[in-house]
Amino acid sequence: MAEKFIKHTGLVVPLDAANVDTDAIIPKQFLQKVTRTGFGAHLFNDWRFLDEKGQQPNPDFVLNFPQYQGASILLARENFGCGSSREHAPWALTDYGFKVVIAPSFADIFYGNSFNNQLLPVKLSDAKVDELFALVKANPGIHFDVDLEAQEVKAGEKTYRFTIDAFRRHCMMNGLDSIGLTLQHDDAIASYEEKQPAFMR
């Protein structure tokens, strides 16, 4: 079972860039591992650091600004997560500490992979995202309340509605990944296997 996502309140960091691809999110040289942990250290590596080894932080990159340390909600522009279909991208985001990404649109494969990894991708219109960028930049350190059950983002004095597919919403709220969904039918699977001839088991 994965961690359930129902509501989250977190610090928001504004990444004011469109078409952020998966190679920017987690560069290919860090993809050797097959476990989900450890990728956060290399999130946005080529932007966060001035050296290849990731030891010299880039002071001009927003994730390195002191006021955004500990951010768990990423505000971005359109077509977030485009490029190759590596699942390491949501792994890196969640390992870094992000729970939510808000953007006008997402690449389809990244969007699906996010749900599989309990990272909530929230789609809002360009105009609403513009409002949120203005709000965050005027109020560094602001927190948003994200309510998956109500499908709402509360930011400042305003509430923004979003829509998530009912099945994906159910899975996130109940902490069900692909394995968890399969285990829900464990008894039925065991019963089926018992009925099979011995040579097929």
Curated annotation (Swiss-Prot):
One of its GO terms (biological process) is L-leucine biosynthetic process. InterPro entries: 3-IsopropMal_deHydase_ssu, Aconitase/3IPM_dehydase_swvl, AconitaseA/IPMdHydase_ssu_swvl, IPMI_Swivel, LeuD. GO terms for cellular component: 3-isopropylmalate dehydratase complex. It catalyses: (2R,3S)-3-isopropylmalate = (2S)-2-isopropylmalate. Its EC number is 4.2.1.33. It holds the Pfam family Aconitase_C. One of its GO terms (molecular function) is 3-isopropylmalate dehydratase activity. SUPFAM superfamilies: LeuD/IlvD-like. It comes from the Bacteria. It is an enzyme of class 4 (lyase). Signal peptide: none annotated. Pathway: Amino-acid biosynthesis; L-leucine biosynthesis; L-leucine from 3-methyl-2-oxobutanoate: step 2/4. Keywords: Amino-acid biosynthesis, Branched-chain amino acid biosynthesis, Leucine biosynthesis, Lyase. Heterodimer of LeuC and LeuD. Catalyzes the isomerization between 2-isopropylmalate and 3-isopropylmalate, via the formation of 2-isopropylmaleate. Belongs to the LeuD family. LeuD type 1 subfamily. This is 3-isopropylmalate dehydratase small subunit. It comes from Escherichia coli O6:K15:H31 (strain 536 / UPEC). The gene is leuD.
